């Protein structure tokens, strides 16, 4: 029987939460699925919400870079706090360069899960499998 574990956004909100995930994963689980990083505290923003805001800012030609910077800070902080080698800065720079009015909302918002999954895969020592595959 195939065993899959799913962790929501608050379970992967920061490096401390990643450590908890690693500690509780049953070795019999073959697949781990994660949401985008969630809130670290009540007044914090979910990465998914920030991505939706970026999409709205792009649609109405409003500056979105400060929102994107919050996402960059979150992911780079997790990477650095866990001592990971995944060059997330490259994927973030690529995404930043792709941002435009014609970008699919689904694609943009899915980047939160994608980047979180890349980080957790390295941290757990699991192979990364892109959901699109």
Name each region found by the language model.
Residues 1-133:
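Nucleotide/pyrophosphate-binding catalytic subdomain
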């Amino acid at each position: 029987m195939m065993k899959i574990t799913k962790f929501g956004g608050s379970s992967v909100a920061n490096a401390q939460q990643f450590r908890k995930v690693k500690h509780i994963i049953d070795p019999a689980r073959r697949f781990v699925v994660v949401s985008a990083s969630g809130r670290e505290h009540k007044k914090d923003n979910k990465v998914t919400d920030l991505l939706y805001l970026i999409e709205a800012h792009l649609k109405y030609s409003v500056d979105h870079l400060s929102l994107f910077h919050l996402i960059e800070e979150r992911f780079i902080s997790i990477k650095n706090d866990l001592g990971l080698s995944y060059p997330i800065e490259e994927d973030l720079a690529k995404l930043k360069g792709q941002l435009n009015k014609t970008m699919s909302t689904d694609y943009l918002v899915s980047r939160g899960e994608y980047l979180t999954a890349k980080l957790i895969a390295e941290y757990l020592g699991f192979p990364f499998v892109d959901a699109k595959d």
